[in-house]
Amino acid sequence: MLHKYLKLICLLAAICVLCIISQNSTKIWGALKLPNSHYYSNTSMISSIPKMSVSPVKSLTETELRVKEILEKLDRLIPPRPFTHVNTTTSATHSTATILNPQDKYCVGDQLDILLEVRDYLGHQKEYGGDFLRARMFSPALKAGASGKVTDFNNGTYLVSFTLFWEGQVSLSVLLIHPSEGASALWRARNQGYDRIIFKGQFVNGTSHVFTECSLTLNSNTEECKYLNGRDQDVFYCMKPQHMPCEALTHVTSRNRDISYLTSKEKNLFHRSKVGVEIMKNQHIDVSQCNKSKEVKEKCQIGMKIPVPGGYTLQGRWLTTFCNQIQLDTAKISGCLKGKLIYLMGDSTLRQWIYYLPKVMKTLKFFDLHETGNFKKHLLLDAEKHTQIQWKKHSHPFVTYQLFSVIDHGYIPQEIDRLIGDKDTVIVITFGQHFRPFPIDIFIRRAISVRQAIERLFLRSPATKVIVKTENIREMHIEAERFGDFHGYIQYLTLKDIFKDLNVGVVDAWDMTIAYGTNNVHPPDQVIGNQINMFLNYIC
């Protein structure tokens, strides 16, 4: 009898367990769900079930901590500067510049220091720093120029230092690009939203073409396609078109959205008359050679630390201050490039390089890859010398009115991971201009991902050469909130911080384009030629 009761109790217990499992099956199987591996080439529809991370928790935590550290550093660099009236903001006209320890005679190699005291429109001395300034010295007749170094004492005074690199009459310039109140407003506005740019994705299914809105962030109110790079968690979303799969996305374009996060009062700081105003009017000095001996410098090599400024222009030629730079002729360039595989990864400022090179090396010919548009992959070949040079655009965000293909594009870290590398492989990287309209954390994460990909490359191929080209300065009066140089300067500082101590060569295009005074996102051929010559000095 006892045996029958025990069997009955076991049966009832089993029935209860089955009921519990049935009622909670979604939770149980959801908890056991294994992570999916996603790469950018894969597409998936957004579901309501949260997906587990594909990256190790440790590496994600390290990245998040690094992002947080950099953001905190930048927030300290650009503190909030609220103001009640434009009259209390920095005025170039009312500010003063005083040459310290003026000399009767200046010699090549001397340092010239200038004390800058900034005041507001009412003539009151400012009590804090943060103004976005640009210092430059130049001699138009000599086609000479160099940037100056600005030290902010955070009390309304600045030290502007120039190294006198050439003899002759030298003009001095310190531009107030934006007052500290404007810089603070741009920083706050930048990090408030992702919607200054509208992306449109083209989906193709046979003869049907449909455009839907795309974004770097998820709009949870609509059914969307998610394009995910699993390793670095880079993601791009598009609204899913009806009757088409997510895999049907072929092209993307973008437009500026009519939106601003600046107040009406703040917008007054960015009128053309208030951007790039000269503080030092008609200031110049005469510099003599003084028979000073020239310092003997070692050959330019990858991994060298670059001072500020890192060089200057004279007779239109860029001359470095930290290494012995050689002006390479056609024969030397030809010999250097023999057997080289060169990968240019980035934006249209690097595409200028691949357009310029055939003008110097007539044996380099474009190979037709049967792609269309300005942002197609470009390939230069010299079959006899076994030279290959490729330019490929970086992935999202890529801002352009022109339609570009997303069939064969990848994030720079992905492209680096696909390369085997060897002593004759060279990679050149640039990114930044297309990141300016978006919160800075996107740029920070991408820069960290690129660094990590380079470190992985060096593990499997330490002999591979990597060169980083920084951003060019661009048009002075372009829309400051979306594309202005203040955003570029913050990215320039961030990139230098993230890439410090990494064994790469740097073509400091920011410093170079200030020296040339181009103020053009696509500088003329003379500047491009000198950027390329600096690059060749690293690899030849």
UniProtKB/Swiss-Prot annotation:
InterPro entries (UniProt xref): Ig-like_fold, Ig_E-set, NXPE4_C, NXPH/NXPE
Q: Which residues are glycosylated?
A: 24, 42, 87, 155, 205, 291
Describe, from its UniProt entry, the tissues in which this protein is expressed. Answer: Intestine, and to a lesser extent in kidney.
Gene3D superfamilies, sorted = Immunoglobulins (2.60.40.10)
- UniProt keyword list: Glycoprotein, Secreted, Signal
What's in the GO CC field? extracellular region
Signal sequence, start to end: 1-22
State the similarity comment: Belongs to the NXPE family.
User: What's the protein called, per UniProt?
Assistant: NXPE family member 1
Organism, scientific name: Oryctolagus cuniculus
Show the taxonomic lineage. Eukaryota, Metazoa, Chordata, Craniata, Vertebrata
